[in-house]
A protein has these predicted regions:
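Short, basic phosphate-binding NTP loop
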Residues: 1-5
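A structural motif detector for beta-strand N-caps
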Residues: 6, 12, 17-20, 24, ...
Length: 58
């Protein structure tokens, strides 16, 4: 689920069953693995690779 207020780059790769909360930003050249959770207001700048089943808080 991607919250409607989240901003996700078209150049980002998002895995399956990923939750991206309100007001998150996922930048270019970011890969988020399956099952990850980004709580509200998380910003991920590239180049970044995130493995499976991680949880991020602001």
């Amino acid at each position: 689920m991607i919250h409607p207020t989240a901003v996700i780059s078209e150049k980002a790769t998002i895995g399956e069953n990923v939750t991206i909360g309100p007001f998150c930003v996922v930048d270019d050249d970011v890969s988020i693995g399956d099952g990850c959770i980004l709580k509200s207001h998380v910003v991920v700048r590239g180049p970044t690779r995130i493995g499976k089943n991680n949880k991020f808080y602001p």
